[in-house]
């Protein structure tokens, strides 16, 4: 069963290194390379652990480890290629990217093509933890961290409303640092 699952992961990977939200590929946003819900990160974590010979994968022979490493490396290359550049500067990522052009794309109605705070933060954490320590990956991480520093939101406090949902209220005394879920691709302002 585990080998069937791994074969599924290998088969689902696009030639550019990304993975669709669903496989076999369906039309619409399901075909997009999906960072939303950490989908691609979870796949890359499994491949990384397999390639590194993690105890959970003690059964893996060298050929399977090499196959996992190759898929992992393709995934990292895809992450590098998807990092949105604005005026020649690397920024962060969208929650979903087009499977061929790698451009940011819309998913569900509430998920516009945009720069994404949450998915990008988790992607940077993943790269810092498990990414190869190449000059390119260091540049990717540094660029994203600079973008986060320049786009943090201050003067707000996170609270719960009467229905138990999260609200944000203006509070100049707040020491919380927050980021928006989505930022406009042209203005980099919160949406």
Which role does the model predict for each range below?
Residues 11, 15, 49-52, 56:
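Alpha-helix capping at helix-to-loop junctions
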Residues 2-19, 69-88, 140-157:
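Long, well-ordered core segments of solenoidal/helical folds
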Residues 1-3, 51-73, 130-142:
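Structural helix-adjacent loops and short alpha-helical linkers that scaffold large soluble proteins
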Residues 91-152, 159:
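Long, repeat-rich segments with strong aromatic
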Residues 1, 36-51, 115-129:
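Well-ordered alpha-helical segments within folded domains of soluble proteins
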Residues 31, 35, 39, 64-71, ...:
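Extracytoplasmic/periplasmic, Sec-exported soluble proteins
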Residues 21-38, 89-114, 160-191:
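Carbohydrate-binding/catalytic loop surfaces
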